[in-house]
From Swiss-Prot:
Photosystem II (PSII) is a light-driven water:plastoquinone oxidoreductase that uses light energy to abstract electrons from H(2)O, generating O(2) and a proton gradient subsequently used for ATP formation. It consists of a core antenna complex that captures photons, and an electron transfer chain that converts photonic excitation into a charge separation. The D1/D2 (PsbA/PsbD) reaction center heterodimer binds P680, the primary electron donor of PSII as well as several subsequent electron acceptors. HAMAP family: PSII_PsbA_D1. It comes from Brassica napus (Rape). A quinone binds at H215. The lineage of its organism: Eukaryota, Viridiplantae, Streptophyta, Embryophyta, Tracheophyta. SUPFAM superfamilies: Bacterial photosystem II reaction centre, L and M subunits (SSF81483). The record marks A344, A345 as: Cleavage. This is Photosystem II protein D1.
């Protein structure tokens, strides 16, 4: 008997690296998008933690009045934030080597731009990695499509809005109270509450929460009992089992009698598509709204739109919102200008008619 042995050529280092990167057998899938995602997210996270703890005050408005954002400079978890890059920098690319010194870079808010740009690259690569893993496992690509909604929202507030307004100083601060400040100022300057795309986003988020709670409670209430009364119903499920774990007919019948016959889904696949699509489409619209308001295509203005036969203004809730907007605009960046643009007009807007 003759044995013929074929000597396999040793695989190159690059080939082994490619196989390891794209292997679905790894505990955590890396993928080609992961090659870029890992360093960018690690950089953004590391700089965020360091800056949140120890960054010196930043001259956000470019008027030599620094604003403190870090814990070591008097803030707590609620009030602390990464202060946006100075208005003196505008939209310029501002890496460390563009500043005369690290102190100057910190004073002008360089960490904000570094964190935001690395973060946006990282989350975009995370979305690509979701698609890549789905592709390699033979799955459909809708996980990455759903994740595109928060990616679009983050891109809108951290990149598109600063581009439209002309400065990274108008981007959303990276902190709790900074986020609230951004929301208040955005309302004052763009009347976002009266923008239909924001309304669709609210419907998407609250509606998605409602539908998720309804679906979860219906499924939990119609589980097929596999255990005794003394055991948890959850013990009756085995991972990977072929049998249905709940009675969709019972859930559909309950919901149809609670509201009306055709209110519930009788197809589990279309139901779950709806649960995914509703909030995703809503957040897409919100991101689109932020991106249009970035270029000052603002919410509806119904100020003083109702008058009586004598021409006297009858105030509506739109006028109440307008008054609140003026108050918020007066208070923000109070040292950067003498008057907000709305109040510095030749003819002051009438409030009481």
């Amino acid at each position: 008997m003759t044995a013929i042995l074929e000597r396999r050529e040793s695989e190159s280092l690059w080939g082994r690296f490619c196989n390891w990167i794209t292997s679905t057998e790894n505990r955590l899938y890396i993928g080609w998008f992961g090659v870029l995602m890992i360093p960018t997210l690690l950089t953004a996270t590391s700089v965020f933690i360091i800056a949140f703890i120890a960054a010196p005050p930043v001259d956000i408005d470019g008027i030599r009045e620094p604003v403190s954002g870090s814990l070591l400079y008097g803030n707590n978890i609620i009030s602390g934030a990464i202060i946006p890059t100075s208005a003196a920098i505008g939209l310029h690319f501002y890496p460390i080597w563009e500043a005369a010194s690290v102190d100057e870079w910190l004073y002008n808010g360089g960490p904000y731009e570094l964190i935001v740009l690395h973060f946006l690259l990282g989350v975009a690569c995370y979305m690509g990695r979701e698609w890549e893993l789905s592709f390699r496992l033979g799955m459909r690509p809708w996980i990455a499509v759903a994740y595109s909604a928060p990616v679009a929202a983050a891109t809108a507030v951290f990149l598109i809005y600063p581009i439209g307004q002309g400065s990274f100083s108008d981007g959303m601060p990276l902190g709790i109270s900074g986020t609230f400040n951004f929301m208040i100022v955005f309302q004052a300057e763009h009347n976002i509450l009266m923008h239909p795309f924001h309304m669709l986003g609210v419907a998407g988020v609250f509606g998605g929460s409602l539908f998720s709670a309804m679906h979860g409670s219906l499924v939990t209430s119609s589980l097929i009992r596999e255990t005794t009364e003394n055991e948890s119903a959850n013990e009756g499920y085995r991972f990977g089992q072929e049998e249905e774990t709940y009675n969709i007919v019972a859930a559909h019948g309950y919901f149809g009698r609670l509201i009306f016959q055709y209110a519930g889904f009788n197809n589990s696949r279309s139901l779950h598509f709806f649960l995914a699509a509703w909030p995703v489409v809503g957040i897409w619209f919100t991101a689109l709204g932020i991106s249009t308001m970035a270029f000052n295509l603002n919410g509806f203005n119904f100020n003083q739109s109702v008058v009586d036969s004598q021409g006297r203004v009858i105030n509506t809730w739109a006028d109440i919102i307008n008054r609140a907007n003026l108050g918020m605009e007066v208070m923000h960046e109070r040292n950067a200008h003498n008057f907000p643009l709305d109040l510095a007009a030749v003819e002051a807007p009438s409030i009481n008619g």
